[in-house]
């Protein structure tokens, strides 16, 4: 009787829990695919802001997102 209980517990409780963990990865993969659709300028802007770096701008066009490179 104990063996049947262990087998039932394994297949009815543990096996479904193990398969549910695989489903949790799907939203992350979808999000990564959406990021690839950005144009290169938007991607560069996101990367630079994440790294805390600013680009160099020519003197009349200097603003908060870049510094003047002369």
Swiss-Prot record:
Transmembrane segments: none
Protein keywords: Cleavage on pair of basic residues, Disulfide bond, Secreted, Signal, Toxin
Subcellular location: Secreted
Disulfide pattern: 56-68, 57-66, 62-69
GO molecular function: ion channel inhibitor activity; toxin activity
One GO cellular component term: extracellular region
Expressing tissues: Expressed by the venom duct.
Propeptide cleavage-removed residue intervals: 25-53
Pfam families according to UniProt: Conotoxin
Domain of life: Eukaryota
Signal peptide range: 1-24
UniProt free text on domains: The cysteine framework is III (CC-C-C-CC). Classified in the M-1 branch, since 1 residue stands between the fourth and the fifth cysteine residues.
Family: Belongs to the conotoxin M superfamily.
The protein's name in its UniProt record: Conotoxin Lt3.2
Native species: Conus litteratus
Top-level taxonomy: Eukaryota, Metazoa, Spiralia, Lophotrochozoa, Mollusca
